[in-house]
Amino acid sequence: MRSRARTAVSVVAAAGATLLVALAAFFGLQRQGPAEHASTGAGAQELGAPDYGVCRGVSARCYHDWGNFSPATDGYRVLLYTRTAGPRHAHLGPALGAGLNPALADTNVVQNAVVRMGAEHGFTVDWTEDVTQLSTPARLFRYNAVIFHSTSRDALDDAAQTSLRQYIRGGGGFAGIHNAFGTEYNWPWYEGLLGGANFYDHGPEQRGEVVVRSRHDASTSGLPARWAFTDEWYNLVPAPSKVRVLATVDESTLAEGVTGGQGHPGHGRNHPVAWCQYYDGGRAWLTTLGHDAGAFTTDGSFPGAEQFQDMVLGGIESAMGRSPFCRAD
């Protein structure tokens, strides 16, 4: 009888202890939350690195060099994709016609800028907003890199999703610029291609300072240590993980603050704006910058435009394997 009583008391005591631990953890977390963001610039608490079920990171062991590209024979060629299935940035200009390389207006600022880059630096640029141009892996394997620049929402159909995945797995290159982060929200594999990152919100468009964090990629190797630029400064959830951060924004230089329209407090001292990674067999170079059409001007009227364009050019060239990509520090 006494044995059963002692057992019952032990069970009650253990249950009570478990409850106390749980309550302590709960209230501890409740107290920790505000403290995490109490000081300006603390940044959002990161919630871990998502798992996309692929080889990803900064090691070239995640790259598939399967001989799908012959630049010595075929030269270098990229495909610029700017389809929008939602909000359209002004720098894209009017929607393009069907097919490959449709007519461009002067107000198709991004498309004209990338075509000019190619012409000046020895690689061919095709452009399209026609999803059927991405309908098979064979179409994409003509290109050393595919560029998504300010695409939006569900810009790919099922066939194009499959083709892009097979292209990357076969050693293809990808460059995602600005609202590439506002694209294919419901496709986890694509989020991984972006570095395990996605657009959440942004604060006011304003001037800030970009800080180069690594020169081990062609995109940042020749840039000044700091340079002024005006942008929206995307806040990200999730934030990039298992990537090499190439550049950040110094949040202390943002006079109007970094808090976004949905309350994101920013990323503190490590607010990434450009990074690179190997992903599922391919190369991916990413930047959240490039909102303002002025960033693509060449007349010196937009501070930081020259540095931004140099970074994008280097990112494209590294993604397509022409220049050093995402090397170890």
Residue ranges of predicted features:
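Structural recognition of the beta-strand scaffold that forms the well-ordered cores
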Residues: R77-T82, V125-T128, N144-S150, I168, ...
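Catalytic beta-strand/loop cores that center a nucleophilic Ser/Cys/Thr
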Residues: Y52-H64, G196-L286
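A glycine-rich, often tryptophan-bearing local segment used as a flexible ligand/cofactor-contacting loop or short
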Residues: F148, S152-A225
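Extracytoplasmic/secreted cell-surface and envelope-processing proteins
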Residues: R88-H91, S135-R139, D154-Q161, G176-I177, ...
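Secretory targeting and sorting signals
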Residues: R2-Q30
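Aromatic-Pro/Gly-enriched surface loop or interdomain linker
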Residues: S39-R142, I316, P324
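C-terminal region of N-terminal signal peptides and the immediate post-cleavage residues
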Residues: A22-Q45
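A conserved amphipathic helix/loop scaffold
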Residues: H91-A95, P102, D106-V110, P224, ...
